Design a protein with these regions (language model features):
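Solvent-exposed, non-transmembrane regions of integral membrane proteins
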Residues: 1-192
Length: 192
């Protein structure tokens, strides 16, 4: 029923959730005085971070979406449950570059939820063309809108990425660092 890739993802998700819950349970062990055992808490915090890292990387790899559009002004672009309205394109000038800036609105019914302004920048010295990504970060999902160099004046090539759980990758690294540092601190205090 499942492909080999899906079984691997299910296995990794299950193992990471198990690691997170077991680490939380072990980290909250109490001694005879009903106080939390501090060295175990640091170790468990680092393991929770590692489990969360695996969980968020697998979830991102599994549920991330990308769609490429050829769009013109006033087009509506749909990716999963997200609707984007391509509002405008204009030329702007920066300190050392000229840019083509597009405006996309993330819509909910007729309400604008967020605004994206990706750019194509042309630098004169040295001559370079770059695409500047517009990113909106939410708690559970990051959304990227990238505009590529237009092939003609009627359409703009647009890539929209929906990346879930990116924030949790950063949170997991912070948890691992705090857990590791606290385990080291409590170990040094115990030695003295």
């Amino acid at each position: 029923y499942f492909s080999e890739l899906e079984l691997t993802q299910i296995t990794l998700l299950t193992l990471s959730l198990t690691l997170v819950f077991v680490s939380i349970k072990n980290g909250l062990r109490v001694n005879n005085n009903y106080s939390i055992i501090k060295p175990a808490l640091g170790k468990s915090l680092a393991h929770v971070g590692f489990g969360l890292l695996i969980l968020s990387v697998v979830a991102n790899g599994t549920f991330a979406r990308e769609k490429i559009f050829q769009a013109k002004v006033n087009d509506t672009l749909q990716i999963d449950n997200y609707t984007f309205k391509f509002d405008s394109v204009e030329q702007t000038k920066g300190v050392n570059f000229n840019a083509i800036t597009a405006t996309f609105h993330l819509m909910n019914d007729q309400t604008v939820m967020d605004t994206f302004t990706p750019e194509i920048r042309v630098y004169s010295n040295p001559p370079t063309v770059t695409s500047e990504t517009s990113i909106i970060r939410k708690l559970l999902t990051d959304i990227y809108v990238v505009m590529n160099v237009p092939e003609n004046s009627n359409f703009v090539n647009v890539r929209i990425h929906v990346k879930p759980m990116i924030s949790f990758i950063w949170l997991s690294v912070i948890l691992m660092a705090i857990g590791g540092l606290s385990a080291i601190v409590f170990r040094f205090k115990k030695i003295r």
